[in-house]
Structure formats: structure tokens, C-alpha cells
């Protein structure tokens, strides 16, 4: 969601919250990230078939950035995801995936990972770039400073 807010500086964002819907933690995150600051540029949907998504994206002034949370819960398979991206080559698709043993869960998600230009893995509130355009090896973006402190072994006494 934090990335979605930043992307609002460059165009409209469609956040497809299939996994969380708009549950309490989603609403809390909307609050502490001050998503009201990008009201109108950050749109959230909680359901919709692939056909409905395609129809939405064909409309004039449709979102430039599409965040799908998550690939597994969306219920699409790999060929459908590829078709969606090929149908709208000027749009940016961001796929969120569930993990199993530090890898995207399911064969379709693993295949999708390898055709994406940029892969970002978030571990312990740190986002590591694993894509084709990585910066310094081992560098990361801090997603939530307090979360890093709370999950580290160096807790204040």
C-alpha cells in the first residue's frame, strides 16, 4: 500500500484487495499511511473477474498502475496473467504473491516471477530488490522502522 501511495504521484492506482478485502488491518493501514491524501488517485476493489478487470482497464482514464493482492486469491492462472499484461502493455502490473519456503506459492506464481522485470521480496519489514535492475547487493528499503526494531534481536531493554 505504501508503494501504491507513492505511485499516485505518477498516475492513478488500482489496488485489487482480493486477499484482505477491506478488513480491520487494511483499514488501519489506510489510516496510518494517510491514504486520504491520495483520495481519488488510489482506488480499491475487493472482487471482480478477469473479464471485469479487462473491461475496467479498457475505459478512458483507467488506472496506470494495477496492484493485485494476491495472485493466488485472484484465482487467475499464469496464461491469464500474461494475457492481461500483454493486453495492456503501457500499464504497470504489480503482483503480490503468497510464499512457501521463501518462494512464490504455486507453479503459476513462480513462472510469473520470472517474467517480471522487478522482483521485490519483503522480509522483516525490509524490501529487497531481486530484479534485473538491482542497486547495491544486499541493500534494502525500510518498509516500517518500528517493525524492524520489534522483530530484531536487538530490542531495547
Please report, for each region that a protein language model flagged, where it lies by residue.
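Conserved P-loop
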Residues: 1-51
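Conserved catalytic network of the ASCE P-loop NTPase/AAA+ motor domain
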Residues: 6-9, 37, 58-61, 85-89, ...
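Short, ordered loop/turn segments at secondary-structure junctions
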Residues: 18-20, 71-72, 98-99
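Helical mechanochemical/support elements of P-loop NTPase systems and associated helical scaffolds
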Residues: 22, 49, 77-80, 84, ...
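Short, well-ordered secondary-structure micro-motifs
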Residues: 26-29, 54-57, 78-79, 105-107
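Phosphate-binding/switch loop-helix module in NTP-utilizing enzymes
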Residues: 44-96
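Phosphate-binding/switch region of NTP-binding enzymes
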Residues: 86-157
Amino acid at each position: 500500500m505504501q508503494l501504491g501511495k507513492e505511485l499516485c504521484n505518477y498516475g492513478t492506482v488500482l489496488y485489487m484487495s482480493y486477499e484482505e478485502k477491506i478488513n480491520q488491518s487494511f483499514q488501519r493501514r489506510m489510516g496510518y499511511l494517510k491514504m486520504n491524501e491520495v483520495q481519488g488517485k488510489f482506488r480499491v476493489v475487493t472482487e471482480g473477474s478477469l473479464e471485469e478487470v479487462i473491461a475496467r482497464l479498457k475505459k478512458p482514464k483507467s488506472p496506470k498502475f494495477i496492484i493485485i493482492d494476491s495472485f493466488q486469491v485472484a484465482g487467475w492462472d499464469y496464461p491469464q496473467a500474461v494475457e492481461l499484461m500483454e493486453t495492456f502493455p503501457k500499464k504497470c502490473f504489480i503482483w503480490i504473491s503468497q510464499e512457501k519456503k521463501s518462494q512464490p506459492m504455486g507453479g503459476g506464481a513462480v513462472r510469473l516471477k520470472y517474467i517480471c522485470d522487478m522482483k521485490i521480496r519483503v522480509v522483516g519489514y525490509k524490501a529487497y530488490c531481486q530484479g534485473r535492475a538491482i542497486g547495491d547487493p544486499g541493500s534494502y528499503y525500510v518498509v516500517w522502522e518500528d517493525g524492524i526494531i520489534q522483530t530484531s534481536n536487538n530490542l531495547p531493554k
